[in-house]
UniProtKB/Swiss-Prot annotation:
GO terms for cellular component: extracellular region. Residues 1-24 form the signal peptide. This is Sauvatide. Keywords: Amidation, Amphibian defense peptide, Cleavage on pair of basic residues, Secreted, Signal. GO terms for biological process: defense response.
């Protein structure tokens, strides 16, 4: 009976550890996805603002 308790405890412990690793990897993937979305948004803003910046810098160079 004692062996069954220990083995059950070991199985549950290993299951929890593997779940925590999976959650950690999922969080990293989500963070990477969020970073790539932020980079896309920044790139879109730069695209919109680039013509205005170029016009201002050309005007100051005259």
């Amino acid at each position: 009976m004692d062996i069954l308790k220990k083995s059950l405890f070991l199985i549950l412990f290993l299951g929890l550890v593997s779940i925590s690793f999976c959650d950690g990897e999922k969080r990293q993937d989500d963070d990477e996805a969020n970073e790539s979305e932020e980079k896309k948004e920044i790139h879109e803003v730069e695209k919109r603002l680039r013509p205005a910046i170029l016009v201002r810098t050309k005007g100051k160079g005259k």
